[in-house]
Amino acid sequence: MATAVQQKIRERGFLDGQFLIAMPSMFDANFARTVIFVCAHSEDGAMGFVLNRPQRLTFPDVLLHLQLLDPDEVIRLPSAAREFQIQAGGPVETGRGFVLHSDDYLSDSSIPVSDDICLTATLDIVKAISRGEGPLKATMLLGYAGWGPGQLENEISSNGWLTCPAREELIFSRDLDEKYDRALALMGISPAMLSSDAGHA
Protein backbone atom coordinates (compact mmCIF):
# COMPACT_ATOMS: atom_id res chain seq x y z
CA MET A 1 0.00 0.00 0.00
CA ALA A 2 2.95 2.35 0.52
CA THR A 3 5.99 0.90 -1.23
CA ALA A 4 7.93 4.15 -1.78
CA VAL A 5 7.24 5.26 1.76
CA GLN A 6 8.31 1.88 3.14
CA GLN A 7 11.60 2.14 1.25
CA LYS A 8 12.26 5.55 2.80
CA ILE A 9 11.58 4.21 6.28
CA ARG A 10 14.06 1.36 5.86
CA GLU A 11 16.86 3.87 5.24
CA ARG A 12 17.74 5.02 8.75
CA GLY A 13 18.94 8.61 9.24
CA PHE A 14 20.00 10.66 12.24
CA LEU A 15 16.56 12.30 12.60
CA ASP A 16 14.70 8.97 12.64
CA GLY A 17 12.64 8.64 15.81
CA GLN A 18 12.90 12.35 16.58
CA PHE A 19 10.22 14.96 17.16
CA LEU A 20 10.19 18.10 15.06
CA ILE A 21 8.60 20.97 16.99
CA ALA A 22 7.60 23.99 14.92
CA MET A 23 9.13 27.32 15.90
CA PRO A 24 7.01 30.50 15.93
CA SER A 25 8.80 31.46 12.70
CA MET A 26 7.07 28.55 10.92
CA PHE A 27 4.49 30.42 8.86
CA ASP A 28 3.39 27.51 6.66
CA ALA A 29 -0.19 26.90 7.84
CA ASN A 30 0.29 23.17 7.32
CA PHE A 31 2.95 23.09 10.03
CA ALA A 32 2.35 26.03 12.40
CA ARG A 33 2.46 24.79 16.03
CA THR A 34 2.87 21.19 14.92
CA VAL A 35 4.70 18.27 16.46
CA ILE A 36 5.98 15.81 13.85
CA PHE A 37 7.32 12.31 14.41
CA VAL A 38 10.11 11.66 11.89
CA CYS A 39 9.93 8.11 10.56
CA ALA A 40 12.56 8.30 7.84
CA HIS A 41 15.48 10.58 7.11
CA SER A 42 18.22 10.08 4.54
CA GLU A 43 20.13 11.99 1.89
CA ASP A 44 17.08 11.50 -0.34
CA GLY A 45 14.77 13.42 1.99
CA ALA A 46 12.58 12.82 5.00
CA MET A 47 9.06 11.81 5.91
CA GLY A 48 7.06 11.92 9.10
CA PHE A 49 3.63 12.41 10.60
CA VAL A 50 1.99 15.44 12.18
CA LEU A 51 0.77 14.32 15.60
CA ASN A 52 -1.51 17.16 16.66
CA ARG A 53 -3.92 17.87 13.81
CA PRO A 54 -7.47 16.53 14.12
CA GLN A 55 -9.26 14.73 11.32
CA ARG A 56 -13.03 14.93 10.94
CA LEU A 57 -13.35 11.35 9.76
CA THR A 58 -14.03 8.69 12.36
CA PHE A 59 -12.74 5.13 12.26
CA PRO A 60 -16.22 3.81 11.33
CA ASP A 61 -16.19 6.35 8.45
CA VAL A 62 -12.92 4.83 7.23
CA LEU A 63 -14.30 1.28 7.47
CA LEU A 64 -17.41 2.29 5.52
CA HIS A 65 -15.31 4.04 2.86
CA LEU A 66 -13.13 0.95 2.47
CA GLN A 67 -16.25 -1.22 2.28
CA LEU A 68 -15.08 -3.24 5.27
CA LEU A 69 -18.28 -2.51 7.14
CA ASP A 70 -21.98 -2.17 6.37
CA PRO A 71 -23.79 0.85 7.88
CA ASP A 72 -25.95 -1.37 10.08
CA GLU A 73 -22.83 -3.02 11.55
CA VAL A 74 -21.34 0.15 13.08
CA ILE A 75 -23.23 -0.35 16.32
CA ARG A 76 -21.64 -3.79 16.72
CA LEU A 77 -18.06 -2.51 16.54
CA PRO A 78 -16.05 -2.84 19.77
CA SER A 79 -16.09 0.45 21.67
CA ALA A 80 -12.32 0.82 21.22
CA ALA A 81 -12.80 0.64 17.45
CA ARG A 82 -15.67 3.16 17.44
CA GLU A 83 -13.51 5.59 19.42
CA PHE A 84 -10.22 4.88 17.61
CA GLN A 85 -8.54 8.17 16.82
CA ILE A 86 -7.93 9.40 13.29
CA GLN A 87 -5.54 12.28 12.71
CA ALA A 88 -4.40 14.40 9.78
CA GLY A 89 -0.82 13.19 9.29
CA GLY A 90 0.30 15.80 6.78
CA PRO A 91 -0.42 17.41 3.40
CA VAL A 92 1.04 14.64 1.19
CA GLU A 93 -1.21 11.82 -0.09
CA THR A 94 -4.04 12.72 2.27
CA GLY A 95 -6.17 9.86 0.97
CA ARG A 96 -3.68 7.26 2.18
CA GLY A 97 -3.88 5.82 5.69
CA PHE A 98 -1.01 4.84 7.97
CA VAL A 99 -1.12 3.34 11.45
CA LEU A 100 1.60 4.16 13.96
CA HIS A 101 1.50 1.58 16.71
CA SER A 102 3.25 -0.19 19.55
CA ASP A 103 5.38 -3.20 18.69
CA ASP A 104 3.04 -5.77 20.25
CA TYR A 105 1.35 -6.02 16.82
CA LEU A 106 3.47 -7.10 13.86
CA SER A 107 2.46 -8.25 10.41
CA ASP A 108 4.60 -9.00 7.37
CA SER A 109 4.13 -5.39 6.26
CA SER A 110 4.89 -3.75 9.63
CA ILE A 111 8.04 -1.62 9.63
CA PRO A 112 9.93 -0.68 12.81
CA VAL A 113 10.53 3.08 12.87
CA SER A 114 12.09 3.21 16.34
CA ASP A 115 12.86 0.80 19.17
CA ASP A 116 9.21 0.46 20.21
CA ILE A 117 7.15 2.09 17.44
CA CYS A 118 6.09 0.45 14.17
CA LEU A 119 4.27 1.61 11.07
CA THR A 120 1.76 -0.49 9.15
CA ALA A 121 -0.01 0.75 6.05
CA THR A 122 -2.10 -2.23 4.95
CA LEU A 123 -5.70 -3.28 5.47
CA ASP A 124 -4.65 -6.09 7.82
CA ILE A 125 -4.19 -3.75 10.76
CA VAL A 126 -7.40 -1.86 9.99
CA LYS A 127 -9.33 -5.12 10.08
CA ALA A 128 -7.58 -6.19 13.29
CA ILE A 129 -8.48 -2.90 15.01
CA SER A 130 -12.10 -3.24 13.86
CA ARG A 131 -12.24 -6.65 15.56
CA GLY A 132 -10.64 -5.39 18.75
CA GLU A 133 -7.47 -7.35 17.96
CA GLY A 134 -5.14 -4.49 17.09
CA PRO A 135 -2.10 -3.16 18.95
CA LEU A 136 -2.37 -1.88 22.51
CA LYS A 137 -1.39 1.61 21.39
CA ALA A 138 -2.10 3.00 17.94
CA THR A 139 -3.26 5.98 15.96
CA MET A 140 -4.27 6.25 12.31
CA LEU A 141 -2.97 9.12 10.23
CA LEU A 142 -4.26 10.23 6.84
CA GLY A 143 -1.44 11.69 4.77
CA TYR A 144 2.12 12.45 5.78
CA ALA A 145 4.71 15.22 5.74
CA GLY A 146 7.53 14.92 3.23
CA TRP A 147 10.75 16.79 2.43
CA GLY A 148 13.08 16.59 -0.55
CA PRO A 149 16.88 16.16 -0.36
CA GLY A 150 18.37 18.69 2.07
CA GLN A 151 15.05 20.50 2.55
CA LEU A 152 14.46 19.54 6.18
CA GLU A 153 18.09 20.22 7.12
CA ASN A 154 17.75 23.72 5.65
CA GLU A 155 14.54 24.35 7.58
CA ILE A 156 16.19 23.25 10.83
CA SER A 157 19.28 25.40 10.24
CA SER A 158 16.95 28.34 9.50
CA ASN A 159 15.35 27.88 12.94
CA GLY A 160 12.12 26.49 11.53
CA TRP A 161 12.18 23.45 13.82
CA LEU A 162 13.42 22.29 17.18
CA THR A 163 14.30 18.60 17.49
CA CYS A 164 14.29 16.18 20.40
CA PRO A 165 13.96 12.41 20.93
CA ALA A 166 10.36 11.22 20.52
CA ARG A 167 8.35 9.90 23.46
CA GLU A 168 5.86 7.08 23.00
CA GLU A 169 3.35 8.51 25.47
CA LEU A 170 3.17 11.74 23.49
CA ILE A 171 2.83 9.98 20.13
CA PHE A 172 -0.26 8.10 21.31
CA SER A 173 -1.80 10.78 23.54
CA ARG A 174 -5.38 11.55 22.54
CA ASP A 175 -5.16 15.15 23.79
CA LEU A 176 -4.04 16.82 20.58
CA ASP A 177 -4.37 20.37 21.91
CA GLU A 178 -1.72 19.79 24.58
CA LYS A 179 0.87 17.99 22.46
CA TYR A 180 2.71 21.11 21.30
CA ASP A 181 3.26 22.48 24.80
CA ARG A 182 4.12 19.02 26.12
CA ALA A 183 6.70 18.50 23.38
CA LEU A 184 8.32 21.83 24.24
CA ALA A 185 8.32 20.82 27.90
CA LEU A 186 10.43 17.77 26.99
CA MET A 187 13.14 20.28 26.13
CA GLY A 188 12.54 22.44 29.20
CA ILE A 189 10.99 25.19 27.06
CA SER A 190 7.74 27.06 27.58
CA PRO A 191 5.80 28.68 24.70
CA ALA A 192 6.35 32.07 26.37
CA MET A 193 10.12 31.58 26.22
CA LEU A 194 9.93 30.76 22.53
CA SER A 195 7.82 33.73 21.55
CA SER A 196 9.92 36.17 23.58
CA ASP A 197 13.14 34.87 22.01
CA ALA A 198 11.81 34.75 18.46
CA GLY A 199 13.76 37.01 16.15
CA HIS A 200 16.74 37.42 18.49
CA ALA A 201 20.19 36.17 17.64
Swiss-Prot record:
Q: Which domain of life is it from?
A: Bacteria
GO CC entries: cytosol
Q: Which InterPro entries does the UniProt record give?
A: AlgH-like
Any one Pfam family here would be DUF179
The record's comment on protein family reads:
Belongs to the UPF0301 (AlgH) family.
**Entry protein name:** UPF0301 protein NGR_c05390
| Organism of this sequence | Sinorhizobium fredii (strain NBRC 101917 / NGR234)
Higher taxonomy = Bacteria, Pseudomonadati, Pseudomonadota, Alphaproteobacteria, Hyphomicrobiales
